[in-house]
C-alpha cells in the first residue's frame, strides 16, 4: 500500500505525465515493481498510460478528489447546523441549488430534534417544503416559472399548495423566512432562510423542522437562522 501511494504521488507531481523509469526513481522503487503497480493502478482506474508511454492519474482519482472535497466541505458546514439544532431544539437542514435542482445536502437531528420523514425527495417537492420555497423565492419570475414547468405541483398533504398563482404569492416574505405548514408532511412544520453568495445569488437554503405548534417560536428566531445562513455562506465562499 505504501509503495502504491508513493508511486501515485510521483505520478501526481507531473502535470503532463512521466515515464515509468522516472517514476521508479522518484518513488524509490525497483523498475519491475513500478511496472507491476502501474498496471494494477491502471486496471483499477487510478492511473492511465498515454500513447507516448507517459503515465498520468486516472479518472477515478478525480472522482475521489471530488468526493473528498465534498466531505471536507460538509465537515466544515456541519458545526453550524448542529449549533442551530441545539439552539432551537429542532432538526436543521441545509440544501443547495445544484444543476437546476434543489438537493438536500445534510441534516443535523437528534432524539429531541427528530427529522421529518423524507418520504418524497426534495427534488420533487420544492413547492411543498420551506427549503424549496425559499430557493424559489430568490428566483426571478421567468426562472421560477421555468422550474415549476418541469416540476408538477404534486398534492402531498391536504395543506399542499398546488395552484400556481397561490404558490407564487406565497413566495414573498418581508423577513426572508419561508414556511411550510404541514405542506410536505402532516404533523411537521418547517421554516427556511436563503443562503446566498457574495453577489446575492442564491446557493441554497437553511431550514429547521418542528411540530406545527412550535412554528411561531421558530419564526421569532428568524435572526438566529439568518446568522447561521451567513456563517454557512462564508464557509462556502472560502472552501468551495
Predicted segments, located by residue:
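Short, basic/aromatic recognition patches
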Residues: 76-84, 148-191, 231
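A short, hydrophobic, proline-anchored segment that marks a local hinge/packing element in signaling
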Residues: 191-199
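Juxtadomain coupling helices with adjacent low-complexity linkers
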Residues: 164-168, 186, 202-240
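N-terminal helix-turn-helix
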Residues: 1-71, 230-238
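Amphipathic alpha-helical effector-binding/dimerization core
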Residues: 53-150
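An N-terminal domain-start capping segment
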Residues: 1-15, 81-104, 227-240
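A structural signal for short hydrophobic beta-strand segments in well-ordered beta-sheet cores
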Residues: 47-48, 94-95, 195
Amino acid at each position: 500500500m505504501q509503495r502504491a501511494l508513493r508511486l501515485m504521488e510521483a505520478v501526481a507531481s507531473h502535470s503532463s505525465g512521466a515515464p515509468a523509469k522516472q517514476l521508479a526513481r522518484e518513488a524509490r522503487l525497483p523498475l519491475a515493481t513500478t511496472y507491476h503497480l502501474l498496471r494494477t493502478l491502471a486496471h483499477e482506474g487510478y492511473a492511465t498510460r498515454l500513447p507516448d508511454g507517459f503515465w498520468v492519474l486516472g479518472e477515478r482519482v478525480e472522482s475521489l478528489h471530488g468526493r473528498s472535497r465534498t466531505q471536507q466541505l460538509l465537515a466544515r458546514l456541519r458545526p453550524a447546523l448542529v449549533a442551530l439544532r441545539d439552539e432551537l431544539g429542532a432538526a436543521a437542514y441545509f440544501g443547495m441549488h445544484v444543476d437546476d435542482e434543489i438537493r438536500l445536502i445534510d441534516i443535523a437531528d437528534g432524539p429531541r430534534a427528530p427529522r421529518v420523514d423524507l418520504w418524497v425527495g426534495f427534488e420533487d417537492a420544492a413547492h411543498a417544503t420551506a427549503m424549496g420555497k425559499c430557493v424559489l423565492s430568490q428566483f426571478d419570475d421567468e426562472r421560477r416559472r421555468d422550474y415549476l414547468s418541469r416540476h408538477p405541483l404534486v398534492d402531498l398533504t391536504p395543506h399542499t399548495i398546488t395552484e400556481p398563482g397561490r404558490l407564487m404569492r406565497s413566495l414573498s416574505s418581508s423577513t426572508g423566512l419561508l414556511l411550510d405548514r404541514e405542506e410536505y408532511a402532516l404533523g411537521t412544520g418547517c421554516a427556511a432562510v436563503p443562503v446566498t453568495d457574495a453577489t446575492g445569488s442564491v446557493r441554497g437554503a437553511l431550514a429547521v423542522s418542528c411540530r406545527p405548534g412550535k412554528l411561531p417560536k421558530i419564526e421569532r428566531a428568524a435572526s438566529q437562522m439568518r446568522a447561521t445562513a451567513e456563517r454557512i455562506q462564508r464557509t462556502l465562499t472560502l472552501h468551495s
